[in-house]
Regions:
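Positively charged, polar, low-complexity stretches
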Residues: 1-105
Length: 105
């Protein structure tokens, strides 16, 4: 999945993301309403999040990730194995919760 981020921007986001822990895990139950709601909340609050895809094989994870990116209007910053770093900017971020504002100042 290609994202509309400049290489320098992507590098900076990966550096921030390196310190983050996955906040949402998609497991055997797949994309339940609870997972979707939690992902939406996490993107709204934190803007930059890690997502763990603990399901199926690579093709299944690719399909799930593509679906999530489209549904939640998020950009893929990086994908390593079953962990993805997602970005969706919030027009009015909370400085106490946003991983971007807290790390970039």
């Amino acid at each position: 999945t290609e994202s509309p981020l400049a290489p320098a921007q992507r590098r900076q986001l990966r550096a921030i993301g390196h310190q983050l822990r996955p906040v949402v895990t998609v497991a055997g139950g797949g994309l339940s309403d609870g997972v979707r709601a939690e992902l939406e909340r996490a993107l709204e609050d934190h803007e930059l999040i890690k997502l763990r895809l603990a399901v199926g094989d690579r093709e299944m994870r690719d399909a799930l990730l593509a679906q999530l990116l489209q549904e939640h209007r998020a950009a893929l910053v990086q994908r390593t194995g079953n962990v993805a770093l997602l970005l969706r900017r919030n027009p009015q971020p909370d400085p106490r919760k946003s991983n971007l504002l807290r790390r970039l100042g």
